[in-house]
Design a protein with these regions (language model features):
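Phosphate-binding P-loop
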Residues: 4-10
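Hydrophobic anchor at the beta1->P-loop junction of P-loop NTPases
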Residues: 13-15
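P-loop (Walker A) phosphate-binding loop of NTP-binding proteins
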Residues: 18
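Hydrophobic positions on the alpha1 helix immediately C-terminal to the Walker A/P-loop
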Residues: 26
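Active-site signature of alpha/beta-hydrolase-fold catalytic machinery across serine-
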Residues: 29
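Short, well-ordered beta-strand core segments
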Residues: 131, 147-151
Length: 186
């Protein structure tokens, strides 16, 4: 491979767009239809902050996050879930506590770099034919040479309604007006 093109799976599609636009739903469905790996980069940040908080830290502890990532404790699952020390993480990374802490972690440049490199490394395996990825840095940093990059956008009110319903479906307390304001503030 050329020096400026990082190793990546043979075929990559990335979806980007604002929170609540439906990009994760579309990416997950597309990956399932194609039989490819699905990567939800947002789930990575959630998994890392969950592990940091589980370790006893009270905030987005950069040193602890980097330590956990350097230990190869996290693994991509083909369906987009993340395993930590073999335990597949699900609803525990979608809690209000994680929602509050995850943006602080995502603001840490070294942690973002470490997460992105971990995803790239794990998906370079020859058996990974294709990847559909969405979320932070998917098309710009993780897979900059993706064969197809899609931007998904929908009106703000639709995004708020989708996120509110998603929370309710996951048994997470939710207030439509609060979500609408949060999305507006982003």
């Amino acid at each position: 491979m050329s020096g400026d093109k990082p190793a990546q799976p043979r075929l990559v599609v990335t979806l980007d767009g604002p929170s609540g636009s439906g990009k994760s739903t579309l990416a997950r469905q597309l990956a399932r239809e194609l039989g490819w790996h699905y990567v939800d980069s947002g789930a990575w940040y959630r998994a890392v902050i969950w592990a940091v908080l589980e370790s006893g830290a009270l905030t987005a502890d950069e040193a602890k996050a980097l330590e956990l990532l350097s230990q190869n404790s996290f693994r991509c699952q083909p369906d987009g879930l993340i395993a930590f020390h073999g335990k597949v993480l699900g609803p525990e990374i979608r809690s209000a506590e994680i929602d509050t802490a995850v943006s602080d972690l995502a603001d840490l440049a070294e942690v973002r770099t470490a997460i992105n490199k971990t995803i790239q490394k794990q998906l370079q395996a020859p058996q990974v034919e294709g990847v559909v990825a969405d979320g932070r840095d998917a098309g710009s940093v993780i897979f900059p040479h993706a064969q197809l990059k899609v931007y998904v956008d929908v009106p703000l009110e639709t995004r708020a309604r989708r996120r509110h319903q998603q929370n309710l479906d996951s048994d997470i307390a939710s207030d439509h007006a609060t979500i609408l304001q949060s999305l507006t503030d982003r």
